[in-house]
């Protein structure tokens, strides 16, 4: 999953292109967090070098060091930690994959047929990478109350402002 951030010399990713805006924002926030961990510029000159694209060698090595934390399937035997997933046994009945999106109506909304603007069964399946980003976005943006999800680490709600400075 992280190896997609590494590219051939001169051909670096410039944007995320998920089919949903919330996944693009979650990806950008995750990338900002990773870069914050991997690059700790000491001063303005170091920041300028990073902005101008110098010193990417350390970035590739750092991403490789973090790769085990983003494992989606566990180890070779299918055991061990997985990205954004609990190690405890799951209880209850499984939810459809579209429940990973915070705008999906819950069981009560579907029972009352109040899901007029957000249709049910929009996403019958997701690829592995999309499912991982949807899981991360849910854990990053989950509001309080509602469908039985824990509130996100920032207290609920996906209100975010990302500023791109002009060079």
Model-flagged regions — what are they?
Residues 1-167:
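Conserved small-residue
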């Amino acid at each position: 999953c992280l190896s997609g951030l590494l590219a051939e010399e001169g051909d670096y990713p410039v944007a995320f292109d998920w089919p949903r805006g919330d996944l693009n924002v979650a990806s950008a926030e995750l990338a900002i967090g990773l870069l914050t961990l991997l690059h700790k510029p000491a001063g303005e000159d170091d920041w300028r070098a990073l902005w101008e694209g110098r010193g990417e060698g350390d970035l590739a090595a750092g991403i490789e060091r973090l790769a085990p934390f983003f494992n989606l399937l566990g180890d070779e035997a299918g055991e061990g930690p997985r990205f954004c997933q609990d190690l405890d046994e799951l209880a209850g009945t499984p939810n459809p994959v579209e429940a990973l999106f915070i705008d999906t109506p819950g069981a009560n909304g579907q029972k009352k047929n109040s899901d007029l603007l957000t249709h049910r069964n929009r996403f019958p399946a997701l690829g592995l990478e999309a499912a991982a980003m949807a899981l991360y976005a849910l854990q990053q943006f989950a509001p309080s109350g509602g469908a039985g999800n824990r509130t996100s680490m920032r207290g609920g709600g996906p209100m975010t402002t990302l500023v791109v400075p002009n060079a």
